[in-house]
């Protein structure tokens, strides 16, 4: 997968003596010390991220972790103090205002937590608003807006005023407005955080369905690890302006980088995330059909404290499984050939199936 967005050594400072604060960052001084000496707040410090094309990349952290500040740097709503941002192989940190405007209009779109809609306008004209600003003729912009309306499930609401809609419906308008532009990159800042839990779950599902079809690059910000795990192909966890870990949901749950991440992961329902491949035995004990007799099999089972073992044929082909009680019966009967007790109908799961889906 190609890299779509690259953030290199990015720091964002707010306050008076930025030059002095930058020096102190390079010297490795801590946030508190820099604030005390220069009056500068370090919102983001030395962030490095690579976001792949078509990936749903979640940036997660508590409030004050710098996640929103960082994302607003991608479309330069916030100016970086140090470092660079690259989009599709172009350094956008040094672009002129004119070029930047083109990128914001054509290549990126943003969805906000509190929707950011124009309450006195209808659904249709809210969705077409960005296209209107670009000077696109009415007929064409309304055609695009209608396509976008269909995608997010707002058909029939075109002429309603936005302030008459529920929160979930309003956020659908926000999403449709962002999509009307056909952006390559979608930035979503706590987009579902203001919604009721049930509506929120529904919007997450809809976003995942949309992403299946659209395959956009989405940077999604949240403070909620369950949401991050449900949505993210990969997750970056931020704390105090620094990126502390980047990984797939499973990597973050099974191998947290530090105590901070561990504390976050403690409340998560692992069954929804951990897959068969991460709990399976990587070097399983097997029974070889022509070679192993009851005595050897019982010994293997005792050693590993297992009541059943997989059976393989001469060509390493999986034949089924064998149960301890049946092996004990064979031994009692004095039979050496185990083929009569191999159970061929064995429930199986795919490697990427979650534990929750595996259990009845």
Can you describe what each PLM-predicted range is?
Residues 23-33, 90-91, 128, 132, ...:
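Conserved ABC ATPase "signature" region
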Residues 75:
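Helix-to-loop junction immediately C-terminal to a conserved catalytic motif
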Residues 83-91:
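Conserved ABC transporter NBD signature motif
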Residues 105, 160-163, 181:
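Conserved signature/switch motifs of ABC ATPase nucleotide-binding domains
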Residues 121-128:
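Short coil-to-helix segment of the ABC ATPase nucleotide-binding domain corresponding to the Q-loop/switch region
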Residues 246-247, 255, 321:
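ABC ATPase "signature
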Residues 286-306, 312-313, 328-360:
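The conserved cystathionine-beta-synthase
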């Amino acid at each position: 997968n190609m890299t779509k967005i690259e953030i290199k050594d990015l720091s964002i400072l707010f306050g008076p003596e930025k030059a002095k604060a930058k020096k102190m960052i390079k010297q490795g001084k801590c946030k508190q010390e820099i604030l005390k000496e220069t009056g500068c707040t370090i919102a983001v410090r030395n962030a490095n991220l690579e976001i792949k094309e078509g990936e749903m990349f979640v940036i997660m952290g508590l409030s004050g972790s710098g996640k929103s500040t960082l994302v607003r740097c991608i479309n330069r709503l916030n100016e970086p103090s140090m470092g660079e941002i690259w989009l599709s192989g172009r350094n956008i940190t040094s672009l002129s205002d004119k070029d930047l405007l083109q990128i914001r209009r054509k290549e990126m779109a943003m969805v906000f937590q509190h929707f950011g809609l124009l309450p006195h306008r209808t659904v249709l004209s809210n969705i077409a608003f960005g296209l209107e600003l670009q000077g696109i003729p009415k007929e064409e912009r309304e055609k695009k807006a209608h396509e976008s309306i269909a995608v997010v499930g707002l058909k029939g609401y075109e002429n309603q005023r936005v302030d008459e809609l529920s929160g979930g419906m309003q956020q659908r308008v926000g999403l449709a407005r962002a999509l009307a532009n056909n952006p390559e990159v979608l930035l979503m800042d706590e987009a579902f955080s203001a919604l009721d839990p049930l509506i929120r779950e529904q919007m997450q599902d809809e976003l995942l369905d949309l992403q299946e079809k659209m395959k956009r690059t989405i940077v999604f910000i949240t403070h909620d690890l369950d949401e991050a795990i449900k949505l993210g192909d990969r997750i970056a966890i931020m704390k105090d302006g620094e990126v502390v870990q980047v990984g797939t949901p499973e990597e973050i749950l099974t191998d947290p980088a530090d105590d901070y991440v561990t504390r976050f992961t403690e409340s998560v329902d692992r069954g929804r995330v951990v897959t068969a491949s991460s709990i399976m035995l990587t070097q399983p004990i097997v029974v070889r059909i022509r070679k192993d007799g009851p005595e050897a099999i019982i010994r293997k089972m005792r050693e590993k404290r297992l009541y059943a073992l997989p059976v393989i044929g001469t060509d390493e082909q999986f034949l089924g499984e064998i149960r301890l009680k049946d092996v004990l019966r064979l031994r009692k009967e004095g039979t050496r050939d185990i083929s009569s007790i191999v159970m061929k109908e064995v429930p199986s799961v795919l490697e990427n199936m979650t534990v929750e889906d595996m259990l009845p």
